[in-house]
Amino acid sequence: MAKNKDVRVTITLECTNNCAQNNEKKKLGVSRYTTQKNRRNTPTRLELKKFCSYCNKHTIHKEIKK
């Protein structure tokens, strides 16, 4: 008996810093991580502090729509 919506979903986290628009950096792009979250425990958008290889520092990564 499967439910309509799964409790655990795979989400994508994207760097909120403007990595792609920094012209002084050597690498251009946007840092993205994939992870899972439980919809019952965290119904809101997830925000985690992760390492961005394009900024070379820890920045806030927010959940994005698929």
UniProtKB/Swiss-Prot annotation:
Gene source species: Physcomitrium patens
Top-level taxonomy: Eukaryota, Viridiplantae, Streptophyta, Embryophyta, Bryophyta
Stated name of the protein: Large ribosomal subunit protein bL33c
Record's subcellular location: Plastid, Chloroplast
Top-level taxon of origin: Eukaryota
Example GO BP: translation
Major location (coarse): plastid
Molecular functions per Gene Ontology: structural constituent of ribosome
Family affiliation: Belongs to the bacterial ribosomal protein bL33 family.
UniProt cross-references to HAMAP family, sorted A to Z: Ribosomal_bL33
Keywords assigned by UniProt, alphabetized: Chloroplast, Plastid, Ribonucleoprotein, Ribosomal protein
UniProt keyword Protein transport present: no
